[in-house]
Amino acid sequence: MKPSSSNSRSKGHAKARRKTREELDQEARDRKRLKKRRGHAPGSRAAGGNTTSGSKGQNAPKDPRIGSKTPIPLGVAEKVTKQHKPKSEKPMLSPQAELELLETDERLDALLERLEAGETLSAEEQSWVDAKLDRIDELMQKLGLSYDDDEEEEEDEKQEDMMRLLRGN
C-alpha cells in the first residue's frame, strides 16, 4: 500500500500561502508611497532650515540667499611684506655674573647629582649638561680661575715636603 500523501505534507514543509490580488496591490501602493518621499522638503530655503548655524549673538534669522560681506579687491594689490622685528638680545652678563648663575643653576645641580648617583641621562640631558660644563670651563679660563689650581697647590706642597725630608730640614 501507498502511504497517504496528506500525512507527509502536514509533517513536512507547509506550502506558502499565495497572496491575494488585493494584498499585492496594497504592498505595491506602499512601495510607491515610500519612493515618492525621496528628496528635500518643499520650501526648506525660505523656512529657515538651519537655525543653529550663523546665530552668533544675533536674534534676527539670517537669510541663506545673501552671500558673504567680505570685500573683494577689484584691482591688483601689492603684497605688503611684514617686517620681522629683531629679537631682543639678551643682556650681556659679565663673565663673573654668568659663572655665578651657572654655579647656582638648580637643574644643572640635580642632573650632576643624578650622574654621581650612577644614573644614566637621556641624550638631550647629557648634551645640555656637557654644554653648561663647557661654558663654565670657558668662563673660568677667562677669569683666570681653575679647579686644577687647588690640586696643583697641594701637589706643590707635597713636593716641597718631600724635598725637605730628603734634605733633612
Swiss-Prot record:
Q: Where is this region: Disordered?
A: 1-98, 144-169
Q: Is Cell membrane one of the keywords UniProt gives this record? A: no
Whether Hydrolase counts among this entry's keywords is no
Q: Where is the composition biased (Polar residues)?
A: 49-58
Acidic residues bias: start-end ranges? 147-159
Biological process terms in GO annotation = ribosome biogenesis
Feature: compositional bias, Basic residues: 10-19, 31-40
Segments traversing the membrane: none
Domain of life of the organism encoding this protein: Bacteria
Q: Which keywords accompany this UniProt record?
A: GTPase activation, Ribosome biogenesis
Assembly information from the UniProt record: Interacts with Der.
The record's family statement is: Belongs to the YihI family.
Know the name of this protein? Der GTPase-activating protein YihI
Q: Which gene encodes it?
A: yihI
